[in-house]
Amino acid sequence: MMPIFSNRGKKKIVLPLLQYVYEQLYSMNFRDYCFVVGREKRSIEDHFAPHETYLRDLEGNYKKTMKQFYEKLDKSHLVWINQNKPLGFGDAVKRSERYVVTEDFIVHAGDVTILSKNRHPVLRLMDVAENNPDVKAILLCKKVKDLKRYGVPTIKKLSKDLFSVQEVIEKPDKPKSEFGILPLYYFKSEIFSSLKKIKLGKGKEF
């Protein structure tokens, strides 16, 4: 629920980052959402539950923004899943299996926002999936300086902007490429069988 400044009307207003991410995805016609959350679940779930009394007490641009947010929520289907222990991103994805079943799906960490001057990265991932139907997982990568903060892929170049991933090492001491993986993914449901095979990694996380 970290804040982000958003220009709505003539004034800047502060929105929770997760709301901004949700509204980005909503603008791309996503309507089904599965939130995997830990201890802070209550504040997140409360924010995503329309509250008419709260709305009546608001004023100006913020009231208009929240009213539009609630209208979007009313047209969305939200599911909440608990992650009782902080076992990492892989564990969070694995917990969504009963909701996803056999569908292709997007995973967004929700604690960062990814901006683009051109086509949004989510849509670019979907483009790659449509053009490569046999690919089971698509990752978004970027050249970064501090590679020890990222998952780092070993890659083989296929085209200007497309690479085949051979392996991924989380926060490596000796990185094998100059790319870090950003927290935005496109998966087919086969990812769940792969997640069940991996063991705890660095920091005792999946």
Each predicted region: which residue ranges?
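N-terminal glycine-rich phosphate-binding loop and ensuing alpha1 helix
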Residues: M1-E59, K63-K64, R119-H120
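Short, solvent-exposed loop/turn segments that connect beta-strands within catalytic domains
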Residues: G9-I13, L158-F163
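Glycine-rich beta-alpha junction loops
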Residues: E40-K41, K143-D146, P172
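Catalytic-core segments of class I nucleotidyltransferases/pyrophosphorylases
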Residues: V122-L123, E130, S159-F206
